[in-house]
């Protein structure tokens, strides 16, 4: 089976709680290798561009404001069925609906401050990875 790549963002709420290491451990235990990573402070322009697909949605401004409220940890994950596997370990968008033991059930506070972002398809993963990383920044593992 070919290995997939997916993008993961540890959002400002989880970065502020100092749970990056715990989340990384979950990725690795699920068979997802971290092949690129960086911590950045998103600008408003970056956040608006990244979440442009949601621009017409009523939550867009709040989402952008939240994503620029503190640093984020961005990583590219590689593994079998990486997109689906990452979404499974993240849990439901609303942490109140997330299965016990998922990242959002354990570390998220609300549907807005929900700890992590993960690509929802291979197509979006490719677009999102290219938004934050140059090809030479991805390491073979």
From Swiss-Prot:
SUPFAM superfamilies: Nucleoside diphosphate kinase, NDK. Keywords: ATP-binding, Cytoplasm, Kinase, Magnesium, Metal-binding, Nucleotide metabolism, Nucleotide-binding, Phosphoprotein, Transferase. Pfam families: NDK. Its cofactor is Mg(2+). One of its GO terms (molecular function) is ATP binding. It is found in: Cytoplasm. Major role in the synthesis of nucleoside triphosphates other than ATP. The ATP gamma phosphate is transferred to the NDP beta phosphate via a ping-pong mechanism, using a phosphorylated active-site intermediate. Belongs to the NDK family. PANTHER family: NUCLEOSIDE DIPHOSPHATE KINASE, NUCLEOSIDE DIPHOSPHATE KINASE DDB_G0292928-RELATED. This is Nucleoside diphosphate kinase. It comes from Legionella pneumophila (strain Paris).
């Amino acid at each position: 089976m070919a290995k997939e790549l997916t993008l993961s963002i540890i959002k400002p709420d989880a970065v502020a709680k100092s749970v990056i290491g715990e989340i990384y451990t979950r990725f690795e235990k699920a068979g997802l290798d971290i092949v690129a990573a960086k911590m950045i402070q998103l600008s408003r322009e970056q956040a608006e561009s990244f979440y442009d697909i949601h621009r017409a949605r009523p939550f867009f401004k709040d989402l952008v404001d939240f994503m620029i409220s503190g640093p984020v940890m961005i990583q590219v994950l590689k593994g079998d069925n990486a997109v689906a596997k990452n979404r499974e370990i993240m849990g439901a968008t609303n942490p109140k609906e997330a299965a016990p033991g998922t990242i959002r059930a354990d570390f998220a506070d609300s549907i807005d401050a929900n700890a992590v972002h993960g690509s929802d398809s291979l197509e979006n993963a490719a677009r999102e990875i290219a938004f934050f990383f140059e090809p030479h920044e991805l390491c073979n593992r």
